């Protein structure tokens, strides 16, 4: 049975819903998915897919089918001047493609090596961090870290299709559908003014389309041979989508492996981001996926801390303007700021939102960066409550911060450690 047939199975949708809501899932997404399932929103989309497969031109283009074109948008991150291009399908089609991706990643997970950590069932980036930490003599090894430049949108579709054909040989209908999506050259460009014919349709090379659900499966598949090559030779290596790190006992071995990565990517039509290429010595430690390894300890990477502090500063400035404009007290603004960041940093009981304490706490082994964030957060709240950045802000005492809702990351981390140790002890007693 083709995976496409499961897209019409209500029981399959319920399993998907139960899975998503069991994880760190935004509440808004859970509500939208529930409404979509209750309304059987997949039915029109499955009809579009059937029409696509029945259309004789589908193998070449989606031009005369009912499946919509993806929309293109160029977005910029607040923390940098860099822009990136993302693609999205309309909400109903996007939701169906999310289920299809979920099914794909599970059925074909056996294609991938154990050193790949992106978008895999039961595996997270934290598993990569933990495995690297357990690698024998990792603190004495030379490291190489690389980032693939614009990976998703740079994958040459003509090179991916033979790999996809081999992987999905037993499901020709699925292969036909996915090939049609990949080879469709047209997109809707929101930056192009509307013309009489609809006007936003442009033609371009778009790779595997960053932002679309299926790109996760393609990103894993396209470099699986490189992953396997390092795994078979026992070289410490990890890949999370476009982020790569590897280790060697000598600088010469490390450099040879780095050259191998560069050559492999070049053969696949890809290139490395030179600004993110790092050759490390044992005494340097290394950072990977938001974590920093140094002298046998794991902490939050400096770049992650910097990004959070920038967000805190922007929010504090915005709330300072807000309370002055509204004629409200500084304490009102301080309390509002704390509510925003408490939601980001701490998961509430029964809350499935992804938060810092769920992501970082189980992995880090020291609290230096948590302490740095605590001090910065206290300063932002004192500024809002006192209405000044002068020394007068220290008139706002620590007890005042706690009354407004402040929670210390360091304190919460130690409490979490105690809970983890107690739970582990209880489990050992039971066994």
Language-model features: locations:
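Conserved two-metal-ion catalytic palm core of "right-hand" nucleic acid polymerases
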Residues: 1-170, 175, 186, 377-431
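Short Gly/Ser/Thr- and Asp/Glu-enriched loop/turn motifs at secondary-structure junctions
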Residues: 68-70, 239-242, 274-275
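Mobile genetic element proteins and their domesticated derivatives, centered on retroelements
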Residues: 75-76, 100, 211, 215, ...
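Conserved phosphate/pyrophosphate-binding and hydrolysis machinery centered on Walker-type P-loop NTPases
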Residues: 89, 122, 212, 363-370
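Right-hand nucleic-acid polymerase module
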Residues: 98, 199, 203, 228, ...
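Conserved polymerase palm-domain catalytic core
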Residues: 114, 135-241, 245-264, 280
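Beta-rich nucleic-acid/ligand-interaction surfaces
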Residues: 119-126, 245-248, 280-282
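Helical (often loop-to-helix) elements that flank the catalytic cores of nucleotide-handling enzymes
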Residues: 251-272, 295-305
């Amino acid at each position: 049975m083709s995976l496409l047939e499961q897209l019409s199975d209500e029981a399959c949708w319920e399993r998907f819903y139960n899975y998503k809501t069991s994880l760190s899932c935004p509440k808004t997404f859970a509500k939208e998915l529930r409404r979509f399932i209750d309304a059987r929103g997949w039915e029109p989309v499955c009809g579009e897919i059937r029409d696509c497969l029945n259309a004789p031109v589908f193998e070449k283009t989606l031009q005369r089918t009912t499946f919509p074109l993806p929309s293109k948008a160029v977005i910029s991150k607040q923390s940098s001047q860099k822009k990136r291009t993302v693609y999205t399908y309309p909400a109903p089609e996007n939701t169906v493609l999310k289920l299809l991706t979920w099914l794909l990643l599970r059925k074909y997970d056996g294609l991938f090596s154990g050193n790949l950590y992106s978008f895999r069932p039961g595996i997270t980036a934290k598993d990569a961090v933990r495995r690297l930490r357990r690698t024998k003599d990792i603190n004495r090894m030379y490291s190489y870290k690389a980032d693939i430049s614009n990976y998703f949108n740079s994958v040459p579709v003509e090179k991916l299709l033979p790999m996809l054909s081999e992987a999905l040989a037993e499901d020709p209908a699925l292969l036909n559908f996915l090939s049609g999506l990949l080879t469709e050259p047209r997109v809707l460009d929101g930056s192009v003014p509307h013309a009489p014919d609809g006007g936003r349709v442009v033609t371009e090379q778009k790779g595997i389309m960053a932002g679309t659900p299926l790109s996760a499966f393609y990103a894993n598949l396209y470099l699986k041979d490189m992953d396997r090559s390092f795994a078979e030779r026992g070289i410490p290596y990890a890949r999370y989508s476009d982020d790569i790190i590897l280790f060697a006992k000598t600088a010469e071995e490390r450099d040879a492996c780095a050259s191998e990565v560069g050559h492999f990517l070049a053969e696949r039509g890809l290139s490395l981001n030179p600004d993110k290429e790092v050759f490390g010595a044992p005494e340097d430690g290394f950072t990977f996926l938001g974590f920093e390894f140094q002298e046998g300890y794991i902490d939050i990477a400096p770049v992650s801390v910097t990004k959070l502090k920038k967000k805190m500063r922007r929010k504090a400035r915005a709330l300072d303007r807000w309370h002055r404009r509204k004629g409200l007290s500084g304490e009102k603004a301080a309390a509002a700021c704390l509510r925003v960041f408490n939601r980001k940093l701490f998961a509430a009981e029964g809350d499935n939102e992804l938060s810092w304490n769920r992501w970082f706490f189980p992995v880090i082994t020291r609290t230096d960066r948590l302490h740095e964030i605590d001090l910065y957060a206290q300063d932002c709240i004192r500024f809002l409550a006192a209405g000044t950045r002068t020394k007068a802000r220290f008139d706002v005492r620590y007890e005042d911060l706690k009354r407004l809702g402040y929670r210390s990351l360091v304190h919460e981390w130690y409490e979490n450690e105690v809970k983890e140790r107690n739970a582990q002890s209880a489990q050992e007693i039971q066994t």
